[in-house]
Amino acid sequence: MARIDPVRRAKIGRERRRLTRARLLDSAFRMFGRTHGRNTRIEDICAEAGVARGTFYTYYKGLEPLLQELSRQLTRDFNREVHVVLRKLPDAVERTSAAIRYFLHATVAYPRWGWALVNSSVGRYLYGAALERLALASIQEGIDTGEFSLPGAEVGRDIVLGAGFAASITLLRGPTPPDYAEQVARQLLIGLGVSRIRASRVATRRLQTLPAPAFMTLGVRGASASAQSQRR
C-alpha cells in the first residue's frame, strides 16, 4: 500500500476540518434561519449537518461559541459594504437613517438571513458588535453636534438597535407597507431629537445600491458547496 506523504496528509486533514466546520455553520444558518429557529438545539444542527454530537464539540464548546461565529459570518461583509456608504454621508442623522434602512431592506430581501440574525441574537446585538460600536459612535457624534437630543449615547444606541430588532421581526412576519423601513427610520430620528421635517426628508432619501450580497443566501460563503460534495 502506497504511503501518503505526511505533508499531504496534514493538508487533507486541515481541509476536512475546514469543511466540517463550514458544514456546521451552514446547518446552523439553515436551522436558525427558520421562522421558529430560536428553538434550535445542538442535536438539530448535528442532524442537519450529518455529524455526530461528539464531532460538534470538537469544533465548539457549546451553542454560544457557534452563534458568535455565525453572527460574525452573517454580518461581516454586509457591515463592511454599509460602512463604505455611511462614511460618505455628511452627518450622524444621515448615517443613522441609512443604516437602519439598509438592514431592514435586507431583512425583507433575504428573510432566511433576517431570521437567522433574529433567532440567534438572544443576549447579543442583532447586527453584531461592529455595528453596535458604529451606532454608539454615530449617536455620540450627533449629540456632540446638537443633532440629537439625548441624555447619553448609550440611550440612543439602544433606541436604534432595539427599533431595528423589533422592526425586523415585524417585517419578517409581515405583511407591512412597502415603506415600512422608511416609516421606522423617520420615527426613530424624531425620537432622537431630529425635527419632523428633516426626519421625513432624510428617511425617504434615495439610498445607494449595495453590491449583490450573495453570501446572505449562505452564511458560510462557498464552503458549503465543497462540504456537500464531500458527502456525495
Positions of the model-derived regions?
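Amphipathic alpha-helical segments used for helix-helix packing
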Residues: 98-125, 132-137, 200-207
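Hydrophobic alpha-helical connector segments
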Residues: 69, 76, 80-112, 123, ...
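Amphipathic alpha-helical packing segments from all-alpha helical-bundle domains
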Residues: 79, 98, 119-169
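Short hydrophobic/aromatic patch on the recognition helix
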Residues: 50-60
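Alpha-helical DNA-contacting segments of helix-turn-helix folds
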Residues: 60, 66-74, 117
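Basic, helix-initiating cap at the start of DNA-binding domains
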Residues: 1-35, 39-48, 65-68
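C-terminal peripheral helix-coil segments that are non-catalytic and often amphipathic
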Residues: 1-8, 137-144, 173-232
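Short hydrophobic clusters on alpha-helical segments that form packing/core surfaces
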Residues: 24-32, 74, 78, 103
